[in-house]
Curated annotation (Swiss-Prot):
PANTHER family: LIPOPROTEIN SIGNAL PEPTIDASE (PTHR33695:SF1). The gene is lspA. Keywords: Aspartyl protease, Cell inner membrane, Cell membrane, Hydrolase, Membrane, Protease, Transmembrane, Transmembrane helix. The keyword Hydrolase applies. It is found in: Cell inner membrane. This is Lipoprotein signal peptidase. This protein specifically catalyzes the removal of signal peptides from prolipoproteins. It holds the Pfam family Peptidase_A8. It comes from Synechococcus sp. (strain RCC307).
């Protein structure tokens, strides 16, 4: 049934919209580099630009990372089109999360030459991140759950 593919794409579009709206809000309302408490003791908002990959790896590699994001996104769309009907819920969720995350950060790389990050965990020393990063990590979690479930 094409219904599962539709829901994967709709979910990815919704997550992508949340990612892009949050980044635009950060750009309009946060001074660069200044932490502002959002959820006291847990989460701050801090606008930073990441021209590398996850956790600022491969700094200044935004152009080729933009191409990688584009290739991952196109590959996922083809994969969803061909196999999406056969996937479990966990696999479908992983595809939606991964598509939203790769497109979300890819848009930033193509528009700005860097990814906009704005979420900072307070209790831990952890790089600033965004909703697209969260989506990519949730995709990995969904795939791990599916792998355990199939054992």
């Amino acid at each position: 049934m094409a219904g599962k593919r539709f829901w994967i794409l709709l979910s990815a579009a919704g997550l992508l919209l949340l990612d892009q709206l949050s980044k635009q809000w950060w750009l309009q309302n946060l001074p660069p580099g200044v932490s502002q408490s959002w959820i006291p003791g847990l989460l701050n908002l801090r606008l930073v630009w990441n021209d590398g990959a996850a956790f600022s790896l491969f700094r200044s590699g935004s152009q080729w990372l933009g191409w990688i994001s584009l290739l991952v996104s196109v590959g996922l769309l083809i994969w969803i089109g061909r196999r999406g009907r056969q996937w479990s819920r966990w696999q479908a969720a992983a595809a939606a999360f991964l598509l939203a995350g790769s497109v979300g950060n890819g848009i930033d790389r193509w528009r700005y030459g860097a990814v906009i990050d704005g979420l900072e965990l307070v209790p831990f020393s952890f790089p600033v991140f965004n909703l697209a990063d969260v989506a990519i990590n949730l995709a990995v979690l969904c795939l791990l759950i599916e792998a355990i479930r199939q054992r």
